[in-house]
Amino acid sequence: MRDYLASEVRNIVLMGHSGSGKSSVVEAALYFTKATDRLGKTSEGTSVMDNDAEEIRRGLSIYTSIAPVEWKECKINFIDTPGYLDYEGEAQAGIAVGDSALIVVGAKDGVESGTEKAWKTITRRHLPTIFFINKIDEEHASFDKTYQDLRDHFGKTVIPFEVPIMEGDKVVGSVNILRRKAWYYDDRTTPKEVPPALSDIVEEYYSQIAEAIAMTDDDLMEKFFSGESFDENEVAKGLRIGVRNGDIRPVYCGSAVQCTGIERLLDLIREYFPTYAEKGLIEAQDPQGNPVMMETNEQEAFSAQVFKTIVDPFVGKISLLKVLTGVMSTDAQVLNVQKDKMEKLNQIYIVKGKHQIAVGKLFTGDIGAVVKLQSTDTNDTLATRAKPVVYPPIEFPRPMLGVAIWPKTKADEDKMSFALQRMCEEDPSIRLDKNTETHETVLYGMGVQHIDVILSKLKSKYKVEIETSEPKVQYRETIRGTVTAEGKHKKQSGGAGQYGHCFIKFEPCDSEDMVFEETVFGGAVPKQYFPAVEAGLRECMEKGVLAGYKVVGVKATLTDGSYHEVDSKEIAFKAAARLAYKAGMPKAKPILLEPIGKVEVLIPEEYTGTIIGDFNKRRGIILGMDLVDEKEQKITAEVPMAEMQKYATELRSMTQGRGSFVIEFDRYEPAPQPVAEKVIREANLSDDD
């Protein structure tokens, strides 16, 4: 593959619902352009894009994969992203380096939650977009219904550029609306006249295209309303402007597994999607945070951003990056700006699925990989020492589903920690929480399948088998009453004895941490033993008398006591304090506190009633509702954290994958009696075991 400049490169991110055939479209493009000698299929384990063992086993994309094709003197980097919601972190990495989007839609299934999510992304990022209606040859497929579904959901910028030719239930060719010519699959090189049955619809769609073209330029608008036709140059100009601005979003159709519609799709990408050079200027920051404008050409100083990291057991760390400005050369010394460390680019590659092809240079706008960088992670910027710049980080989704994990064999603890650290480097949507209170390692992922893949990979790649359970809820205990209790520790065993004696007043307070005071009069307890009393009480407060949870909101006052001139020691007063705690706290009206979380849920408006009703069942309180746009609602609520353990999975089920949420711990509140009784009973049973 030859070198390509920014004016010849197009970076296309593929998005859409899981199962719509995104990977198959790329496989078809690779095969059609002779980049591969056979049409790869995930189901057969021959896919270039879905090459991981987990992807082959599950029959779906899990990881973002890159594949370049050469087409009519341009290079198209296809960035294939997973459509399944559990792998949104991987998808965001790919979306970050895409300059235009290809949204793939199944001709039988129409608009699904993954399609809607893709639409939100392209509108937020202002990406030029083409829709490809795939699987047009399957039983019960309908171009007309799918197109209308797209139009109903996403508006009049969605315009067909092609319609299929049907003979009975069979697709035999397609009509190019722009050229008003028909191509049949049995003779793909010779254009034919449009079948009479399609003439009216072709003219209707052409009128939609012409009107959209007219809206892109004042001269074209004047010509359109004068009733004049556009020439080829005017059509090309209007389409380029319209597609680039998002005013025109062409719809094409075909069958990736039959390799139909692929040639015209490649032509459309080449002709109407902007090159990377057309960005002109992009914004970065210098190390002090001041804005810096960088030119997207080869003459600008080099800069690149790492968007994905792969830890290969044989090669080591592979950093996938996009050259944002300038030229990247093998053996060059570059600066990791965030870490302020120099890195040597030992070898540069372009990637095609899991395959790496060595190159000497990579130019502005292109995507490639570098191996064995010592200090560089995902989101780091590489640049020159003379012109160090930093680009905005990719915003990865926050994982919300947690499971407690531990290795089946204790000997594997270090191996598990090492493996999880490597996996977090690869996937920023994984989060680990080593909870010192519950002594659990909690693994957070995007969903059940995401966590399942992580555990499967731990076993297959790192040889660590994992046990799991639901994470423990961090309850608290406090008191509502006031009581004074005595603690006396006396030990005599022939030698030096131990003696400590104290009276402790326990009462509620507003402080989360225990407040310790003393009101001892007349030296009943010498000052030197006050710290020992406090230390003994603080140790006890780690384990409440109801269910063994940490105690908060208690003021403990040392009021009186006695000592022995010979036998009193710090350890004795520490023990006496513990005895006072055990005697007094059960009488101070102890209660259980449960953690309350503040939740924000984003859902399509039609699910509002369902979500509110569900929160009521979870003992939640609705704080507010805001209409984010005409179709989306944000609901804010307070809900006990114990009721939200599996909410990531349950929300997806309630909204058909269209909802998302975040939750943050807010405060502790007294648990209702039935809840408290259940928690206390389970804690006592656990202690008995």
Please report, for each region that a protein language model flagged, where it lies by residue.
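Structural and coupling elements of P-loop NTPases
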Residues: 1-689
